[in-house]
Amino acid sequence: YNNWEVIYVIGDLFLKENYVLDGNFLYVRCEDSYLHLLKKLVLSIKYLNEIFIINKGILRCGDDLIINENNLIKFLDDRTTKYDYYGHNPYGKNYICSGNTRNELKKIKKDNFMINYYASHCDDFLNPQHNLKNVNISLYSMRPDIYGASGVIYYISNKACKTLILHMEKINYNILHYDSFTKSYPYTIEDCAVSFIMYFNGINFINSYLFYDSPLHDTIAKHTNKHK
């Protein structure tokens, strides 16, 4: 699409190499679990930057979307304005960083999203590719009380991508890392974690209705898994 590569990313914990690019499929040596989505995302960004010269950024898409190709092509056009961290959330609000942002990140809440997910996906604990043996999900439910782009589909610029890589390198890509600054576990839910990393590093979130599922706007995608 307009010289933008389309790459499908698959985690393979037992891959001998760090990554393998096979056509449009990028296999990354990491867990292929829901809990490890952030790790898979950032590692894939790191390796894609080794493989390709990325001029603008990355449009991160879930695997449960119906794409409107005409709207996608319009978005990818160089003349379309794109922000460093750009997507849509249910609140329909931007988040603009300020001198008080880091204090705001210290506000935390209990989020049972992953607990509820794994309550109905118990077989995942038995899958060696997921590397969840002896992981007690309930211990990692506290996270910063923030909003940002929903993980369905969002755009991150090269600046944002570099920020994600540098931040995750510092914690050795450990999504169960305890963050002493917020006294929480910010990295277990991918979209929440991306928001946290962006705001911690002073990158704003810009909301737009053009990404997905807006009845009043022509969007890039329809989220087919919305109600499951």
Spans of model-derived segments:
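Short, acidic, metal-binding catalytic loop of nucleotide-sugar glycosyltransferases
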Residues: 1-4
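Structural beta-sheet core signal
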Residues: 6-8, 60, 85
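Active-site-proximal specificity loops/subdomain of glycosyltransferases
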Residues: 7-56, 69
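Structured beta-strand/turn binding interfaces of compact recognition modules in eukaryotic regulators
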Residues: 9-12, 31, 62, 89, ...
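Eukaryotic basic, amphipathic alpha-helical target segments in cytosolic regions
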Residues: 14, 49-52, 80, 169-172, ...
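The conserved acidic donor/metal-binding loop of glycosyltransferases
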Residues: 58, 62-66
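Conserved catalytic core of nucleotide-sugar-dependent glycosyltransferases
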Residues: 65-196, 200
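PAPS-dependent sulfotransferase catalytic core
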Residues: 202-228
